[in-house]
Amino acid sequence: MVKSGQIRFPDYRWGEDRLFIFDCLERAGSVAVLPECKYSYIMHPGQSLISSYYDKKFEVCLAADTRAQQLCRRFGAEDDEDFRYMFAKSVFSCLTTLFSPGCRLNRNEKRDVIRGIITNEQLRERSRKPFGGAAVKLLSAVMRSGSVTLNYAAFRFVAWAGQAAPRFFTKLKHRK
């Protein structure tokens, strides 16, 4: 199915592809790297899955991280720093998209979502030893602070910075 391009995911969701890949890895008897790409995204002009608000994004983020941790344990990975980095960036996306034009939540609803995210035990555990550059470490510390107001202000600023200086923002967020 993979070789013939027969796998399709629902349009404009977040995370189904990661969960599918993790499920496949867990069930695979062997894994081979194909010489050409068999995976392509359909990108709609002006839209990005990372920058779009999706109300279940954090739930999918937690599920993908849980699966990644399970696979690391199963295959005896010494360190899961790349997965911790991916998780941190995914959570940052959950928080910054609260301030995107597509998010219709009011201020109090956004604060409730932030509270739910920053008090989540999995997030608190995984953000203790963040892997990444200064931006990842700083934003992880903000999340661990437990302050809804600080997180609201910080991630609102991050969302604004991403719109005001997208190239600089992209370089900064991809620094490991």
Predicted regions and their residues:
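Membrane-interface aromatic/basic loop that binds lipid-linked glycans or pyrophosphate carriers
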Residues: 102-176
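Conserved nucleotide-sugar donor-binding catalytic segment
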Residues: 1-54
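Catalytic-loop motifs flanking and including active-site residues across diverse enzymes
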Residues: 20, 64, 87
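Catalytic core of nucleotide-sugar-dependent glycosyltransferases
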Residues: 36-45, 51-79, 97-124
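Amphipathic alpha-helical repeat scaffolds of TPR domains
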Residues: 85-97
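All-alpha amphipathic helical-bundle segments outside canonical DNA-binding/catalytic cores
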Residues: 78-86
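Alpha-helix boundary/capping detector
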Residues: 28-29, 50-51, 94, 140-144
